[in-house]
A protein has these predicted regions:
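Short linear regulatory motifs enriched in tryptophan with gly/pro/ser
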Residues: 1-214
């Protein structure tokens, strides 16, 4: 009789903000020794808003996962440049970001971030919003945020947010819209080591550092 394959027990994972306790301890110490009480309370309010938003828009997901998601990354600074990418649900946003950067032919030598759209001035703003998930090193200088190595691809509720903004290199400002295209079960012959992968694409990526004319 063939030996049975041992199944890996799945568990639920939901991202949590690191250093939250240290943040509150630092704020409480500062409240006792400063006259800038209103400014500090405002920072706490902003953090509570960020934390509430993430709690409502990130979901618990099973790890490991056999779900494969597809996204279309549409480059915004040049027409008709996009890539459809498939990735396992239990791979991280950091892995997805690194992959699209590499597929564009760029060096991963700058920070990146994903942004949830936000209503501003009567319209929808998709980049540099109040609700970001950034690479390690990204901070808003006020309070701790989630980072892309802590958030799984399947952690985001795409029924609420089928489009996210993505930015690589906050100086040269390479902007993308990331569109959720769907989810499927992995085939038994597919290996996670082969993901992420491009399944369709159009256009030619621009140079990472274009030549500017003085």
């Amino acid at each position: 009789m063939p030996k049975e394959t041992k199944k890996i027990k799945s568990k639920l994972y939901k991202p949590k903000i690191e250093n939250e306790k240290d943040f509150y301890n630092a704020i409480n110490r500062a409240l006792k020794t400063t006259d800038h009480r209103d400014a500090l309370l405002s920072i706490i309010k902003e953090f509570e808003g960020y934390k509430k938003f993430m709690s409502e828009n990130l979901i618990a997901s099973s790890v490991p996962s056999d779900k494969i998601l597809m996204f279309r990354f549409i480059y915004q600074l040049k027409e008709k440049v996009w890539k459809d990418i498939e990735i396992y649900g239990d791979q991280s946003l950091e892995r997805l970001a690194e992959y699209i950067i590499d597929e564009m032919g760029w060096d991963n030598d700058h920070l990146h971030a994903f942004f949830f759209p936000e209503k501003r001035n009567g319209g929808i703003w998709e980049w540099y919003t109040s609700y970001e998930i950034g690479s390690a090193g990204v901070d808003n200088d006020q309070f701790p945020i989630l980072h892309t190595d802590e958030v799984l691809v399947l952690s985001i509720d795409y029924s609420k947010h089928p489009r996210l903004g993505f930015v690589f290199d906050f100086g040269d400002d390479h902007r993308f819209v990331m569109e959720y295209k769907g989810l499927r079960d992995a085939d038994k012959n597919e290996k996670k080591d082969n993901f992420p992968k491009v399944v369709d694409q159009r256009g030619v990526a621009p140079e990472q550092y274009p030549d500017y004319v003085d």
